[in-house]
Amino acid sequence: MVSSLSRNGNSHHNGVNVAITSGFSTKLAPLPNGPLFGTDGIRGKAGDLLTAPFALELGFWAGQVLKANKVTPGPVIIGQDSRNSSDMLAMAMAAGLTSAGLEVWNLGLCPTPCVAHLTRISQAMGGIMISASHNPPEDNGIKFFNHEGTKLSQTLAQQIEDGLRGHLSFDRDRNREWGKTYHQANLVDTYCQFLQETLPENLDLQGMRVVLDLAWGASVEVAPKLFKALGAEVICLHDRPDGNRINVNCGSTHLDLLQQAIKEHQADLGFAFDGDADRVMAVDSQGRVVDGDYILYLWGKHLLEQGKLPHNLLIGTVMANLGFERAWEALGGQLMRTAVGDRHVQAQMWETGAILGGEQSGHIICHHHSFSGDGVQTALHLAALVRQSGESLATLVNESFQTYPQILRNIRVEDRDRRRYWQECTPVMEAVNQAEAAMGNTGRILVRPSGTEPLIRVMVESCSADDANYWVNYLVNVVEQHLAN
């Protein structure tokens, strides 16, 4: 156990150290200089920052902060995806939380929105999900929820980080209130029942053939169970927990195998989830990708026609396609854009009273039912919408909108400061301004650092595919030359 931390950090390791492992060493090394919490909690390679001793210490300080700010008296609920490091991190977090005197409910393997939902309905003090979402197997992450099942505020996240860095004091020797851990995998059934209750009464998917790509991840049990319960014929890909293969060439960011399976099985539609099932991408019977923009349009139109969409308002992000925006406006709707990240979408939904929002990448939030993105719920509701329409998903997509050609490229930039302050690089800004001036109102450009990976993302969108391709290549070359090297 790392020793007590003082306000000035004068412990034997200065209060700013975490364990790194070589084999099973607990040799201490400094925390990184930048913020620990990104847009979706703490992420990194398992065994580097994310070790058992670090998670133990993080759990302890999270427990102290949650206790000090508690609104409800209940437990802290922990879930995890299938990564090989998830057991280790979940158990270490539980040990840290119980050392702070808190009760822990461990759900085991489950989707992230399952943790969020159960946290909200159980009077829990907070929730924790061990997952790196769509990232590769060697990565992992720790994300926090407040008692309402929404993401922990930046203020509380900073307090937890202050504890880790030795800027808060606590005499551990006087702490004699130990918590307990309870294994509550059965509560995942409560979440499944909730999802069914959000669907139209007497919904019957008999005769619908659905392919599910479960990405070797957190949705392997929940998604097939629910679709089968509704009568659908279900064909599953990557359908068992596999910590070595989670997200590898499968799931919501790799749709080739799903598209192939839909054609081979002559399926009506298919869905691909990411590793923790908080996002989903759909594919129609023709093999076309139905991304978050299409899902928002179709679900939004359905709610608009029922009079259940306040102000005809959808919340999207800066990545939302112009074709989607202009088609939605033609229906009398309005699209409000936020920065990328479901945290920003959620905040804008609360501020405006919107009940439907999401991202092109497949994070969809519907306040009629939930307060967090839920891939399985979104897939079920899209299937329900298709069944109620009497049309195929392919027909609904044909009748919706044409996307503008949009090209997204990722450039690996290891230097964190170069990613954060890319706008201070004069050659890059000059190139962006040049491209924007050339395209005028026929397209747009977005350059931004990833919030979860060491990448700078360059997106160019234009009514002309040739223009989009030309300018994205031009900008990528400039970014690689001045930021990546």
Curated annotation (Swiss-Prot):
GO terms for cellular component: cytosol. Binds 1 Mg(2+) ion per subunit. Keywords: Isomerase, Magnesium, Metal-binding, Phosphoprotein. Activated by phosphorylation. Its EC number is 5.4.2.10. The active site is at 133 (phosphoserine intermediate). The keyword Isomerase applies. It is an enzyme of class 5 (isomerase). The keyword Cell division does not apply. Mg(2+) binds at residues 133, 274, 276, 278. This is Phosphoglucosamine mutase.
